[in-house]
């Protein structure tokens, strides 16, 4: 799964996205509703309002602020992930699979290793071996006036499967652009996701 990620203090490209979207009318709307979008680098948790890239109504690529997690009628806990293997079949994700895809910029994602009793242990930051922005595949929907997203996950690559059996779908920059466009096959693009990861102990 993916329940935390990081925007690093030196990741200027993402920090510029944050500055840009905090000047928009959407940011004002969030603040009027008592929701504070992030304004700086740090660890990102569910319910945070963060940058995400998607198409606008004209089909143009834009950076938006979105809340991490879908509200659920039957549970207080937010739905934060979608399995790529089954998303097209699930009613909650079916329309987003074909029409409402986004990518979320990150520096790393976070995972904990687990003992035999499935209790979380050491914390690690993880990213692909390639440099640059880590593009996490996502789906989004509107909840009233609030755009909300989930992060798409896949079976973990062998380099990190000893920590957890799931990991986010991470796309190369070109595939991130293809992912958000409605006329492309999301299954095919997800199948080209980055695999081999590098990790560091984070405390």
Q: How does the language model describe each region?
A:
Residues 1-203:
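Short linear sequence motif anchored by a di-proline
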């Amino acid at each position: 799964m993916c329940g935390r990620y990081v925007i690093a203090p030196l990741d200027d490209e993402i920090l510029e996205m944050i500055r840009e979207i905090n000047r928009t009318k959407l940011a004002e709307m969030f603040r009027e509703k008592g929701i504070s979008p992030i304004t700086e680098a740090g660890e990102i948790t569910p319910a945070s309002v963060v940058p995400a890239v998607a198409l606008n109504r004209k089909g143009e690529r834009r950076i938006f602020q979105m809340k991490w997690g879908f509200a659920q009628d039957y549970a207080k806990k937010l739905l934060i992930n979608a399995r790529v293997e089954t998303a097209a079949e699930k009613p909650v994700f079916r329309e987003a699979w074909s029409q409402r895809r986004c990518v979320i910029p990150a520096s790393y994602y976070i995972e904990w290793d687990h003992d035999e009793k499935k209790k979380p242990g050491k914390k690690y930051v993880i990213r692909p071996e390639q440099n640059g922005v880590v593009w996490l595949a996502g789906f989004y929907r509107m909840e009233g006036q609030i755009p909300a997203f989930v992060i798409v996950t896949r079976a973990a690559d062998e380099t990190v499967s000893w920590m957890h059996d799931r990991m986010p779908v991470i796309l190369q920059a070109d595939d991130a652009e293809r992912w958000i466009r409605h006329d492309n096959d999301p299954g095919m693009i997800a199948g080209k996701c980055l695999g081999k990861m590098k990790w560091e102990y984070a405390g």
